[in-house]
């Protein structure tokens, strides 16, 4: 069972069954359903506290129309964080390294914010294309630039894919190089590996958060 | 909860999915829930449950499970069921970081979770304590009011005395007034009588004087004047005699 570098990114199938579905749904069992008790065990308490705090912080800059997105954004955040963190374990497959998944999340959500903005307040939505206080000769150029910037926003998904893929790949490469190495040099490489691990843990959490944050930002502009 | 809200709203608009409102409708779901255990299961080295060690102790003693673990590991490696590749190193690194993280921050996180629950309990306890103190205070107040109510006879007596005194005062005032009025009437009568007497006396004196004056005849007048002159001469003589002596 030798592994090549990129085996970790191949979408796993078994006898024709795409196991990515399992990889996407099984992490759900890690989050226990809040029980009917008043005082719960530590896991449920922490989970409830975290979800409440996160949602509260996320919804602070949004007005009332944006609060409809609370469940969606919080569940998206939990989903991404779980997938990212579980993917750091050895021999696991990270679904968020697949561009298809991330674009499948980013494009519809971004498009939803744009359409909501265009439907409910078209003037304000189009007004975002021209920042305040621009000198008059720059206006045509700036509008083109802002339109391009608007349409490049689905790069949300690309950002997530790229970050996670790069991180995993770096860890795999550092570990692979570590295998046949002399012990003296191996120490340096293992330090690199250790630091990369720390970075990956941080990146896993941060990227999920950034995804949701930017989405909420786009929502804030348009809702 | 947010998730439950989503699920319930989903069940309302998509009837072809599982009807989530049909779950948990029997009275079984309302039975009292058994208490949660205080602590989680005991583990050795963080992962392996203590029960494995207890299970193997009768047959293999204390080192049994460790030998099992070492033997399994050797078997897996030597038979190449598990091959050491780059993922092993990545796993070793990740394992180190995870174990370090759990050992260092585990107790703090657990204490935080316990604190959250503790605050919940404390809030409810505060309400309960406040209710209890206020009720105890209410009981004391009620007892005080009952004690106060026992003295109502004294209050009534005092009030009755008050009223009696007022009435007595009033009566005495009136008696006093009556006495004064009667005395005034009697004084008037006395004054009237003295006036009468004085007037009668004056009248009589006047009448007597008038009669005396009218009864003095001119003969009497002459004789009296002559007598007076002779008396005066005698007196003058006596006086002259006294003066020369």
UniProtKB/Swiss-Prot annotation, chain A:
GO biological process, alphabetically ordered: proton motive force-driven ATP synthesis; proton transmembrane transport
Matching Pfam families: ATP-synt_A
Catalytic activity of the protein: H(+)(in) = H(+)(out)
Residue stretches in coiled coil: none
Bilayer topology term: Multi-pass membrane protein
Broad class of the protein's primary localization: mitochondrion
Keywords: ATP synthesis, CF(0), Hydrogen ion transport, Ion transport, Membrane, Mitochondrion, Mitochondrion inner membrane, Transmembrane, Transmembrane helix, Transport
Localization, UniProt: Mitochondrion inner membrane
Residue spans crossing the bilayer: 12-32, 69-89, 98-118, 132-152, 165-185, 197-219
One Gene Ontology molecular-function label: proton channel activity
GO cellular component: mitochondrial inner membrane; proton-transporting ATP synthase complex
Oxidoreductase is among the record's keywords: no
Keyword Membrane: yes
InterPro entries named among the record's database cross-references: ATP_synth_F0_asu, ATP_synth_F0_asu_AS, ATP_synth_F0_asu_bact/mt, F0_ATP_A_sf
CDD domains reported for this sequence: ATP-synt_Fo_a_6
Cited function: Subunit a, of the mitochondrial membrane ATP synthase complex (F(1)F(0) ATP synthase or Complex V) that produces ATP from ADP in the presence of a proton gradient across the membrane which is generated by electron transport complexes of the respiratory chain. ATP synthase complex consist of a soluble F(1) head domain - the catalytic core - and a membrane F(1) domain - the membrane proton channel. These two domains are linked by a central stalk rotating inside the F(1) region and a stationary peripheral stalk.
The family this protein is said to belong to: Belongs to the ATPase A chain family.
Binding partners and assembly: Component of the ATP synthase complex composed at least of ATP5F1A/subunit alpha, ATP5F1B/subunit beta, ATP5MC1/subunit c (homooctomer), MT-ATP6/subunit a, MT-ATP8/subunit 8, ATP5ME/subunit e, ATP5MF/subunit f, ATP5MG/subunit g, ATP5MK/subunit k, ATP5MJ/subunit j, ATP5F1C/subunit gamma, ATP5F1D/subunit delta, ATP5F1E/subunit epsilon, ATP5PF/subunit F6, ATP5PB/subunit b, ATP5PD/subunit d, ATP5PO/subunit OSCP.
NCBIfam families given in the database record: ATP_synt_6_or_A
PANTHER family on file: ATP SYNTHASE SUBUNIT A
Protein name from the UniProt record: ATP synthase F(0) complex subunit a
Gene: mt-atp6
């Amino acid at each position: 069972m030798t592994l090549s570098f990129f085996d970790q990114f191949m979408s796993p199938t078994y006898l024709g069954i795409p196991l990515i579905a399992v990889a996407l749904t099984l992490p759900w069992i890690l989050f226990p359903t809040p029980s009917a008790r008043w005082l719960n065990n530590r896991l449920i308490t922490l989970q409830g506290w975290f979800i409440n705090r996160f949602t509260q912080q996320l919804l602070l800059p949004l007005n009332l129309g944006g609060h409809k997105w609370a469940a969606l954004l919080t569940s998206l955040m939990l989903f991404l964080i779980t997938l990212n963190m579980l993917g750091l374990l050895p021999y696991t497959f990270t679904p968020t390294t697949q561009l298809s998944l991330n674009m499948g999340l980013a494009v519809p959500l971004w498009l939803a914010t744009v359409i909501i903005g265009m439907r409910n307040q078209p003037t304000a939505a189009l007004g975002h294309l021209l920042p305040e206080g621009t000198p008059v000769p720059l206006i045509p150029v700036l509008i083109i630039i802002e339109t391009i910037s608007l349409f490049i926003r689905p790069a949300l998904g690309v950002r997530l894919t790229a970050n996670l893929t790069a991180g995993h790949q770096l860890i795999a490469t550092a570990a692979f190089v570590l295998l046949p190495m002399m012990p003296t040099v191996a120490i340096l490489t293992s330090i690199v590996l250790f630091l990369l691990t720390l970075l990956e843990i941080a990146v896993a959490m941060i990227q999920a958060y950034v995804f949701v944050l930017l989405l909420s930002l786009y929502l804030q502009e348009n809702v | 909860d947010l998730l439950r809200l989503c699920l319930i709203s989903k069940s309302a608009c998509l009837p072809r999915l599982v009807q989530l409102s049909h779950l948990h409708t029997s009275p079984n779901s309302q039975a009292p829930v058994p208490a949660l255990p205080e602590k989680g299961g005991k583990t050795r080295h963080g992962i392996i449950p203590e029960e494995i060690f207890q299970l193997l102790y009768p047959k293999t003693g204390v080192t049994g499970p460790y030998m099992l673990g070492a033997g399994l590991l050797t078997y897996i490696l030597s038979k190449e069921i598990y091959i050491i590749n780059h993922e092993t190193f990545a796993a070793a690194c990740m394992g180190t970081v995870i174990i370090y993280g759990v050992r260092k921050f585990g107790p703090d996180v657990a204490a935080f979770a316990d604190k959250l629950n503790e605050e919940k309990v404390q809030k409810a306890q505060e309400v309960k304590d406040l209710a209890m103190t206020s009720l105890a205070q209410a009981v004391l107040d009620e007892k005080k009011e009952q004690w106060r109510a026992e003295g109502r006879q004294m209050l009534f007596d005092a009030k009755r005395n008050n009223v009696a005194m007022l009435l007595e005062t009033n009566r005495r005032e009136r008696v006093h007034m009556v006495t004064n009025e009667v005395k005034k009437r009697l004084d008037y009568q006395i004054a009237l009588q003295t006036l009468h007497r004085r007037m009668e006396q004056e009248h009589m004196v006047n009448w007597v004087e008038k009669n005396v004056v009218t009864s003095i005849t001119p003969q009497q007048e002459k004789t009296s004047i002559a007598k007076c002159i002779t008396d005066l001469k005698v007196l003058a003589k006596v006086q002259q005699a006294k003066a020369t002596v």
